[in-house]
Amino acid sequence: MISITPEILVRAYASGVFPMARAHDDPQLYWIDPDERGVLPLDGLHVSRSLRKVLRHCPFTVTIDTVFVEVLKQCAAPVPGRDETWINAEIEHLFTDLFDLGLGHSVECWQGDQLVGGLYGLAMGGVFFGESMFSRVDNASKVALCHLVARLKRGGFRLLDTQFTTNHLRSMGAVEIARPLYHARLGNALQVMGDFTVDVPDVLAALDTPSGY
């Protein structure tokens, strides 16, 4: 069995494939390149009136890249209604290495000193590959996603890859596109250098500013 390194993982994502495990305790990784790929158009994020109110009077402190490993562990943890996860120890180790290389990123939502929601993924060129999100209180993952999209728009990104779609992601604007179209968009977006560290002083203003993507 070939050992997967961070370098191999980066090349795989750039080629349009990503790894998953069948279960947290399954050490084997499987390469996935679905016929229909989930993406969230950056100008297509659905922000309801009630969510706008939450963002305007945000009950969370939102941070970037401060507790990446903890976000990863929370995403991998079982929750009511989902006893199993595709994030195994190998994925945790690989993405921790990617974070150390400056490629892995997280968005974190806090209430006081409690981490109550967040997401993590991989930034390459003008693409953000969203891996997983979690929420322990109402709206936490939605707020994290809004902050992510605002940052991607401000930073000049062109593609937010969600891998698959879920009811939650579809309600926020995610759609499925055919594999050939995804690969074409991926190739174009990788030619752009997005800036994940860009300052985002006003999330709603960033979300309301068209990016063309």
From Swiss-Prot:
One of its GO terms (cellular component) is cytoplasm. InterPro entries: Acyl_CoA_acyltransferase, Leu/Phe-tRNA_Trfase, Leu/Phe-tRNA_Trfase_C. It is an enzyme of class 2 (transferase). SUPFAM superfamilies: Acyl-CoA N-acyltransferases (Nat). Its EC number is 2.3.2.6. One of its GO terms (molecular function) is leucyl-tRNA--protein transferase activity. It catalyses: N-terminal L-lysyl-[protein] + L-leucyl-tRNA(Leu) = N-terminal L-leucyl-L-lysyl-[protein] + tRNA(Leu) + H(+); N-terminal L-arginyl-[protein] + L-leucyl-tRNA(Leu) = N-terminal L-leucyl-L-arginyl-[protein] + tRNA(Leu) + H(+); L-phenylalanyl-tRNA(Phe) + an N-terminal L-alpha-aminoacyl-[protein] = an N-terminal L-phenylalanyl-L-alpha-aminoacyl-[protein] + tRNA(Phe). GO terms for biological process: protein catabolic process. Keywords: Acyltransferase, Cytoplasm, Transferase. Its main location: cytoplasm. The keyword Kinase does not apply. It is found in: Cytoplasm. It comes from the Bacteria. Functions in the N-end rule pathway of protein degradation where it conjugates Leu, Phe and, less efficiently, Met from aminoacyl-tRNAs to the N-termini of proteins containing an N-terminal arginine or lysine. PANTHER family: LEUCYL/PHENYLALANYL-TRNA--PROTEIN TRANSFERASE, LEUCYL_PHENYLALANYL-TRNA--PROTEIN TRANSFERASE. Belongs to the L/F-transferase family. This is Leucyl/phenylalanyl-tRNA--protein transferase. It comes from Rhodospirillum rubrum (strain ATCC 11170 / ATH 1.1.1 / DSM 467 / LMG 4362 / NCIMB 8255 / S1). The gene is aat.
